[in-house]
Structures are given as C-alpha cells and as structure tokens.
Regions:
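Conserved GNAT acetyl-CoA-binding A-motif
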Residues: 117-142
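Short loop/turn segments at strand-loop or loop-helix junctions that form parts
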Residues: 67-68, 95, 127-132
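Conserved acetyl-CoA-binding loop-helix of GNAT-fold acetyltransferases
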Residues: 97, 101-119
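Conserved acyl-donor/pantetheine-binding loop and adjacent beta-alpha core of acyl/acetyltransferases
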Residues: 31, 43, 47-50, 56-94, ...
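Short amphipathic alpha-helix that is part of the acyltransferase structural core
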Residues: 1-47, 52-61, 188-189, 199-207
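C-terminal "cap" of GNAT-fold acetyltransferases
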Residues: 147, 157-158, 166-206
C-alpha cells in the first residue's frame, strides 16, 4: 500500500484514480478524433514522465488527482475559450476531488504540479480558469466542473491572466523565479514551492 500524501500519476498508479478518469480522453482529443488513452500515456511517459499526481489518505484511499503535462499533449486546449495554451508551458488540465476532501488536497496537488514542472525546467505552468459569481458554493467550484479552475483559487498561487473570453481565462504562472531542486525528491519539491507561496508572518509587537 502506498503511503499518504502526493504520489506521481503513471501507468502503475493510473488504476488508483476515480473510474471516470481512467479512460477519459477529453483533453487528449479534438473535434471528431478520439485519442487512445493507453497510447497517450505511453507517449506522455516517454516524452515527459509522470503526467499528474494523486493524493492518498493514510489508508491508501484516493482523495484527489490532478492531470498535467506539456501543452502539446492536450489538443483540446486549442478549442477552449481563451485558448490555445502556450507552446512553452506545461498545462494543468483537470482536478478530480472526492467529496469530503479537505482544502489542502487541491492545494497540495497544484503545488506538486508547480514543483515538478519547475524541476523539469519548464518555463511556465498554465491552466484554464472560470470566474464564478460571488458566493458560489464550494461544490459548484470544485466538484461540478473539473476541467477549469476557480479563478480566485489560482490567484493564491500567483497565476496571471494571459487571455480571457467571457468568464473563461487562460492563466499563467512563470516558473523561472522558483528555486530548482534535485529531480525526483518530491517532498523537497513540495516544501520549496510551498515556502515560495506562503507569506512571511508579520512579527507581533512586543508588549
């Protein structure tokens, strides 16, 4: 059994994700052409490596998963409002959360994508976002629509709007300013990136 926390999404862990995600090729397809998930996975692992992350609890149960990789692996991005994604960027395509997952799950998964992409020397990370009306429910924002991110969620990580069309935006996070880390050391990746996006506490005045 795998330990709790974030692990890479590969052929070996792909059966851990939710059943609806295992054969989904929405991002990998375009128009009337439907991609083969297995052939896509083989290409992604040969040209990129791990193509996402999973988050497991202490009992080895899935809490969430995130898919990402070089933008050219996701042709659907060209058809989305505000698309296509940039050629030099990795693209975060979808986030699947199970009901009851805490807010730290989606943040940990995105932090892993930021850290791993930076570790590979990628210029930037991009994602499609949607500006939800104020007071929209958490379920609507994270559990109903899984292929676009709430815009204010990406704000927390410093994503900037590259293009917009209506309420949909293509957002970009430049990775050049983040400290590089040794490849494969996921815990250190997460720690370095988390530190980069955690504000320094303001010292309280002494009484």
């Amino acid at each position: 059994m795998r330990g709790p926390g974030v692990s890479g999404l590969t052929t070996g862990t792909s059966q851990t994700v939710a059943p609806v995600c295992r054969d989904c090729v929405w991002w990998q397809s375009r128009g009337n052409r439907t991609a083969s998930k297995q052939r896509w996975i083989e290409r992604a692992e040969e040209e990129w490596g791990e193509w996402g992350s999973i988050y497991l609890d202490e009992h080895g149960r899935l809490l969430g998963s995130l898919q990402y990789g070089p933008s050219y692996l996701f042709p659907r991005a060209a058809d989305l409002p505000a698309g296509p994604a940039s050629d030099d960027a990795a693209l975060v395509t979808c986030l699947y959360l199970l009901r009851g997952a805490t807010g730290w799950v989606e943040k940990s998964l995105l932090l892993a994508a930021i850290g791993e992409s930076r570790d590979r020397g990628t210029t930037a990370l991009e994602a499609f976002a949607y500006r939800y009306p104020e007071h929209e429910t958490q379920e609507e924002r994270f559990l109903v629509h899984r292929t676009v991110f709430p815009r204010d969620f990406l704000d927390e990580f410093g994503f900037a709007t590259l293009r917009s069309q209506g309420r949909v935006e293509l957002c970009r996070l430049e990775l050049g300013g983040l400290q590089a880390v040794e490849e494969g050391r996921r815990a250190k990746v997460l720690r370095v990136v988390q530190d980069a996006f955690t504000p320094t506490p303001i010292p309280l005045p002494r009484p």
